[in-house]
């Protein structure tokens, strides 16, 4: 990410600034605190201050202490952390920012059948065996639809709105989508098995996810939008 010199306030009242000097990386502040008790909101996450290219400079992640034991019992806490980091970096949060005056529209199509139009993300989607365009979630509530990969197509990939028991790999598809956002990330990803011929946005019917075998994280998270824009050196 670009270098920034200046002062950026903490997301938390009474704490030292998140940045006070020069930063050439993303700074993520994390808090474990009560939110709403067990079984409700697991966490909140998103970019806070962004560069003028709409790459994240600082972000924040809150996790509800009342849900930590539950997540540990499912062996999913680490996956939840990395999933929320994805949102901080811009997955589902910085795809479309034209309403801020910056010409980036990585999510296209109707809300009923949205897709990701970034070149790198689609190269890896097709290389993994997917057909058509990389599908974005079209079902669920406001925290699910339009801000995750489509569960019915991508199953256990980490950035769908549903975390499966067992492995939830961060695939080359997500890594490629970060390059489409503008990050200088590697194209490497964890081992991910997408059946060849998996349909993308051209499909007309979608498989139902089995909520008995994992965690619908998208129903239990609040995705935050950026609050400030900084000018780079």
Where are these regions (language model features)?
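Extracellular zinc-dependent metalloprotease catalytic-domain scaffold
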Residues: 1-82, 88-233
């Amino acid at each position: 990410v670009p270098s920034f010199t200046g002062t950026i306030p903490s997301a938390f009242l009474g704490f030292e600034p998140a940045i006070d000097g020069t930063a050439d990386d993303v700074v993520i502040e994390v808090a474990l605190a009560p939110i709403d008790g067990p079984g409700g909101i697991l966490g909140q996450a998103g970019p806070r201050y962004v560069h003028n290219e709409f790459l994240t400079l600082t972000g924040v992640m809150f996790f509800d202490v009342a849900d930590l034991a539950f997540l540990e019992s499912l062996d999913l806490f680490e996956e939840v952390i990395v999933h929320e980091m994805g949102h901080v970096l811009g997955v589902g949060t910085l795809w479309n920012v034209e309403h801020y005056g910056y010409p980036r529209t990585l999510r296209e199509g109707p809300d009923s059948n949205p897709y990701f139009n970034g070149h790198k993300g689609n190269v890896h989607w097709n290389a993994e065996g997917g057909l058509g365009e990389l599908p974005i979630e079209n079902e669920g509530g406001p925290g699910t639809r339009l801000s995750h990969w489509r569960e019915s197509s991508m199953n256990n990939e980490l950035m769908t709105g549903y975390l499966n028991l067992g492995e939830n790999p961060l695939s080359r598809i997500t890594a490629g989508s970060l390059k489409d956002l503008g990050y200088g990330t590697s194209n490497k990803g964890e081992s991910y098995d997408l059946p060849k011929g998996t349909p993308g946005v051209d499909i007309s019917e979608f498989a139902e996810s089995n909520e008995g075998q994992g965690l619908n994280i998208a129903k239990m998270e609040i995705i935050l939008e950026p609050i400030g824009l900084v000018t780079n050196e």
